[in-house]
């Protein structure tokens, strides 16, 4: 896509549309399920989805006409906002929504409490007659839903009610199998006297011509929703309090390209400073940094959002597998609701984690003795001192103005000690629809009871609701109101931070495919030249020593070794060649010993060979520099399926831009001290230079990746309406020149999050205590590396023993196994137990990963890397990445009061228990809630395009070799708080041995086969592949009653009627010339004899010339002496020929090494 022409990605067209959709009951329910709505507002915030809210061929980015000049129009590139706003006849949608109490009143009180600006409709201006609007579009006002989609550059005009509908260009379309009409909206700048060089003061939210006054689409409810859902949130992210000033500035910024001018600083107030003990110099540095990154964030949000982005796979509603596979409407609603339940894990992380991106809107100066600035400060000191922190504290502090004078707080001064509904309303931008959506999730997440606050807390609350004194709903809907929701999750709510501190930020984004998340990540991995993201990374890391090993010319090839091991496992039928799932067959203890011993020997040999290769071609520093990395998508349409995630997307964008902007800001602040009385004056003096410096250095520094979409020509011709004539009442389409304001636009591509698995100890010191490995723990074999096999094949290994696997091994290890337990031959049993214990002990001796494997692929990778690291001299634990994927499980009815269906009216706990019993008796299904399970292979999360929640911080460091450039990288972090997800808690992971500090987790929901249709061929097996697998299995068969070559011939001929060609046979036997020659000789004999019956019995009769053995009881030569183990050898080497390789040894010289190495 990076080489795509701008004109193709963003065609000329309107950047706003109003849709009139003939709706029905089913459409309303689908919209209610996927949208944000509250009974206090007629506006429904819906997702931007092709086939549901916009056309199937909708263009997500356009070059839209903005200003007319003589003979043509000037166009600007913009992308659509990732949401749609329904505003007429929406009661049918809102009626499906769950009541949550008087949310509007709570939002109003929140604004008063924290001095947040409220929306005020224009005085004296009449709203647009929406019924007349429907009639003008040729629709019955009683039968249609009306909604609008708008581009980022047009949303301010939409807010101001200045977009002009052009009904002459109305076009029929279909949305979710409903008839619809689409009408374009044009900006007022096309119809007035504005020219490209007109003074920008003529452009305003309040100034408009009589034509715009009479024809503009003005819906106060839509303006109010934009005010809170978009702009109030933007103000919070920028630490700016004048919402209407920001809207006015955004309007002029798009039309007049004023990104390089100062717009917000003169109006900015600085909050959260008085509670910090800052010197005068530190306060100046913090205020300047605050003002500069606020301006850069606001300017570059316009640059990046008014750009070109293609549609994401997840926004094509009509192709969602959950939609396509639904059997009927009820099944569709069930599937969509379950999808939302999966998302509840991610929503929980955004709410319950103290370091959520939604809370990180405060800038703090954290000093230490090492970083103390004294009389001056370097850029390095400032970058180590200035951080984003949780902004829930200090909300009612006095603030500083532009003149650095203290201003008394105008809100209600209150000491917030506990997280309350006010705080949730605040982070929602006081948008009632968004707040209501969060409450829906809080009513459905799991309850985490504690010894102090057991399940009786919720039941006592519900019993008390009978008094109808609920402050949230007055007793009308206590089963779902926000007070009940907060009681349910009170043990999970985040703690209010007492002191500001540097913490990583928790975000929810969609993943990209490319990843390096195995044990050693980038080390020893070579990348194909075709990999676009790999080439991006190579460019990004120029001058950076920390990731220099992630290039296409890695000195060693670790992937080759892993592929050899995978090929061996496929050859031995231990794993499925397509899915990677375990497929081994174990019929007894000897099978188990042979399989494991042969596999261990092969893996250990590969690890030792890799050690030799690293010693010859690489060095220890390159191993220490191993980096695990994955990419997260910054395309706004990757999250357009959820308005909550679209809301959070803007917060992420502002946070990233401002955090990276700190580098540019601090470099100018250090060199140019504040000498004026006004902060805005200093910013005005330097902003143009700062803007230019940031635009050239913000990306390709290891963290943020941007692509430039270019146009080969700046002018074109097309047929458009004569806008000047249209303003006078006549519609006419003419050919005109179309100019593009910019030939190149930068668009956000992705950002990269990394982790260093190997802890670097300073010279002369030991590793950090979290990674230190001071002793080797002894483990019960069932809890060790072979545990997954011992569990799976317990019945095969010890048939009729009468004990479960865990109990059996506990008794064995305790020397307490009763004599009446059937264990078979005692000698064989002793050998098996010794073997299992020795393998477990050997694995533990080298286990630096400290994560028990749960499948064969897991075991292989862990053993290989453990052995390599130990053989190479590493002794301490390493850090690991873990993917926790969501799944739905049934829960207790009593913890989900929304199932009651009405406000509770219970006199006692017995009444409540009786009501629950009635619910179960009447067939009310147990509620589902989202939990997580650990993914065996982390990379599958990225290969199956998942929605991921991850915590990361943006770290900055200087380049090498006297390079003054400052580089960044996203460092994976932690989730702060015990209520995020129980699997993340210290006690769940391992608190006593610091395992929780070595493991970094991400939460994930796989979108493949849910929202994204698989478009790539995932190793589909052709018929020839299946035949080949059968032939190879026949050649490896241990069945002594059938000649393996005859069995192979039978498999080849089973699907054909003619003798195969030699090339086909060579393919079936995996390129082994000797076997192919032997088979072809037999095929020739069949052809000469004219045989046409290719059954196995007939092939044996025709070709098998072995002497008869006279049944199975004949005498045989005693060859046991050939296989007698030397006395004193380890148990693992005394169990038979396979312990030393034997017939399962995988020798490269045998000619059976698979020619193709496919990646699972």
UniProtKB/Swiss-Prot annotation:
InterPro entries: DBP_sf (IPR035989), Viral_ssDBP_head (IPR043031), Viral_ssDNA-bd (IPR000635). The keyword DNA-binding applies. Keywords: DNA replication, DNA-binding, Host nucleus. One of its GO terms (biological process) is DNA replication. Residues 1139-1160 are annotated as: Required for nuclear localization. Its main location: host cell. It comes from the Viruses. Homooligomers. Forms double-helical filaments necessary for the formation of replication compartments within the host nucleus. Interacts with the origin-binding protein. Interacts with the helicase primase complex; this interaction stimulates primer synthesis activity of the helicase-primase complex. Interacts with the DNA polymerase. Interacts with the alkaline exonuclease; this interaction increases its nuclease processivity. This is Major DNA-binding protein. It comes from Simian cytomegalovirus (strain Colburn).
